[in-house]
């Protein structure tokens, strides 16, 4: 009896393995049929088709596909993709679980995917975690949904407020809010700071960034001691870390029971955030919306669209605010990384402070966004952090069968954009493993940049006559194409304001810089990261 049971179990297991392997191999061998373009024309002949084989790649195993190949690259999967490119070329296929994947590893291929084929490569992975984060439906998220007319409408609605142009009224509003919030931040830090003692300033940095976003988008500011506010700032940071991690569950959904506790935690984070947005922001604001008055902020625009557009629901508003207010976590983590590299290299901090001191001179004011163009080294440092951390671009998904670089790509294929290879290749950068902001600077062809008062920056140091390089084609921190990051100007602007206003007042150091551990390939830092020593500057201008 026992022997029969064992044989039955073995037979079932072998059957599962065989079925899995057959399905995987079918996915690997399947060819893509595409209509042939008529000779010397861009017109398509729908009566003639050509078969395209898929890009080469390693043979997958049953059940797990090629996931085992990344096992030794757990902390740096895109470094694993780069290593595999040495064997299989700049474009190759992988199978994760039963899901076909394509990895593109050079600039020309990335542009072909994101620009030339942006329409058919506009989907997002259908990961269970993505659904759990957004109320059971990832289409609620602007960043994680597939492309659609509703998605385009939401982007258009957000663009005016969330992509402020330089010197526009929204740009000036962002500058004022950022500077005022850093005054609150400085007072709060003064209550916590013990001279010479390290402090974990990440929670305080995140609160300041969260208030900048909530004031800019909702015209509401929250006290740092507000318990509910503290909680949602923490949960936003946890979610930012979560989205930047990979889990076997993403490709092996049968592992779901083992992730139930973790997924419940994710659901709790996101539902708590949405409850806060509903009770503390939307209910507070919807009673005062006036269709005849100009929009005060993004929340006004959303509430008006709720009244005027039948395709916009209350849930649409809640999820859009969750998406965009959550952008503060990216800013906070970026700032922490900048401060970490300053603590590791005091010369970087010194040069940033030289730019600051040259601009404010004897003026009684904080640095603002109008000073950004006169502070090329500071911006170069922020860009070098973005390059060095090489945060992954959210994967794309083929929404129909297509062809990339002569290879067939089947519908549903997940496409990984390997910007890590762009950021670390000696083809594009001199000594790419070295952290060096100067790589983003070049000799200025113009006079010294003007500050917000119209005077020369007057920097008498190595920063003299340097300007920020523009349009570096292989530097894509915010992606390109249809799904480029719509909030990148907010990230740059608020990130700049926090960094310079911290450096204007404090010297940043660490008792032991070697203990500052930074994960590769990620902008996200764990909630409990590294402490820093903030020493008030002896000379900070009249402030």
Swiss-Prot record:
Task: Name what cofactor the protein needs.
Answer: heme
Kindly give the PROSITE patterns that the UniProt entry links to this protein: CYTOCHROME_P450
* GO BP: central nervous system development; cuticle development; dorsal closure; ecdysone biosynthetic process; embryonic development via the syncytial blastoderm; embryonic digestive tract development; head involution; midgut development
Q: Which cysteines are joined by disulfide bonds?
A: none
Principal localisation: endoplasmic reticulum
- Compartments where found: Endoplasmic reticulum membrane; Microsome membrane
Q: Could you tell me which InterPro entries the record lists for this protein?
A: Cyt_P450, Cyt_P450_CS, Cyt_P450_E_grp-I, Cyt_P450_sf
Q: Name one GO cellular component term.
A: endoplasmic reticulum membrane
Q: Which membrane topology term applies here?
A: Peripheral membrane protein
Annotated heme binding sites: 485
Q: Does the keyword Iron apply?
A: yes
Anything else known? Member of the Halloween gene group.
This chain belongs to the protein called Cytochrome P450 307a1
């Amino acid at each position: 009896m026992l022997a029969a049971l064992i044989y039955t179990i073995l037979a079932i297991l072998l059957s599962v393995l065989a079925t899995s392997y057959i399905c995987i191999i079918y996915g690997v061998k399947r060819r893509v049929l595409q209509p042939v373009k008529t000779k010397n024309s861009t017109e398509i002949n729908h009566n003639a088709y050509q078969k395209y084989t898929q890009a080469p790649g390693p043979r997958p195993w049953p059940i797990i596909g090629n996931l085992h190949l990344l096992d030794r690259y757990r902390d740096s999967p895109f470094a694993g993709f780069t290593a595999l490119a040495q064997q299989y070329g700049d474009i190759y296929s992988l199978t994760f679980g039963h899901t076909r994947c394509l990895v593109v590893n050079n600039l020309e291929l990335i542009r072909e995917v994101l620009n030339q084929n942006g329409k058919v490569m506009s989907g997002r992975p259908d990961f269970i975690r993505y659904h759990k984060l957004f109320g059971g439906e990832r289409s609620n998220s602007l960043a994680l949904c597939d492309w659609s007319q509703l998605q385009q409408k939401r982007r258009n609605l957000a663009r005016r407020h969330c992509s402020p142009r330089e010197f526009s009224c929204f740009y000036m509003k962002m500058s004022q809010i950022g500077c005022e919030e850093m005054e609150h931040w400085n007072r709060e830090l003064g209550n916590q700071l013990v001279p010479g003692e390290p402090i974990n300033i990440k929670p305080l940095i995140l609160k300041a960034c969260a208030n900048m976003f909530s004031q800019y988008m909702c015209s509401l500011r929250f006290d740092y001691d507000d318990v509910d506010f503290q909680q949602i700032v923490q949960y936003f940071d946890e979610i930012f870390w979560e989205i930047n991690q990979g889990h076997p569950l993403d490709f092996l959904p049968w592992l779901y029971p083992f992730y139930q506790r973790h997924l419940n935690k994710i659901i709790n984070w996101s539902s708590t955030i949405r409850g806060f947005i509903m009770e503390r922001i939307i209910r507070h604001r919807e009673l005062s919306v006036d269709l005849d008055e100009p929009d005060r902020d993004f929340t006004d625009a959303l509430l008006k669209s709720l009244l005027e557009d039948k395709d916009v629901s209350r849930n649409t508003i809640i999820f859009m605010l969750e998406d965009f207010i959550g952008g503060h976590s990216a800013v906070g983590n970026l700032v922490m990384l900048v401060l970490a590299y300053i603590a590791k290299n005091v010369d970087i901090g010194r040069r940033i402070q030289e730019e600051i001191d040259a601009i404010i001179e004897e003026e009684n004011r904080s640095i603002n966004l109008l000073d950004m163009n006169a502070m090329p080294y500071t911006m170069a440092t922020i860009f070098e952090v973005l390059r060095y951390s090489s945060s992954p671009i959210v994967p794309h998904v083929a929404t129909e069968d297509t062809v990339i670089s002569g290879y067939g790509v089947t519908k549903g294929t997940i496409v990984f954009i390997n910007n890590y290879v762009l950021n670390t290749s000696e083809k594009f950068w001199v000594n790419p493993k070295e952290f060096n902001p100067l790589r983003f600077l070049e000799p200025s062809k113009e006079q010294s940049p003007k500050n917000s008062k119209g005077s020369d920056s007057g920097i008498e140091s190595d920063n003299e006559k340097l300007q920020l390089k523009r349009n570096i084609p292989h530097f894509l921190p915010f992606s390109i194409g249809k799904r480029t990051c719509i909030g990148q100007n907010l990230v740059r602007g608020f990130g700049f304001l926090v960094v310079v206003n911290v450096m204007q007042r404090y010297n940043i150091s660490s008792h032991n810089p070697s203990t500052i551990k930074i994960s590769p390939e990620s902008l996200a830092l764990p909630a409990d990261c590294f402490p820093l020593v903030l020493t008030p500057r002896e000379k900070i201008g009249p402030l």
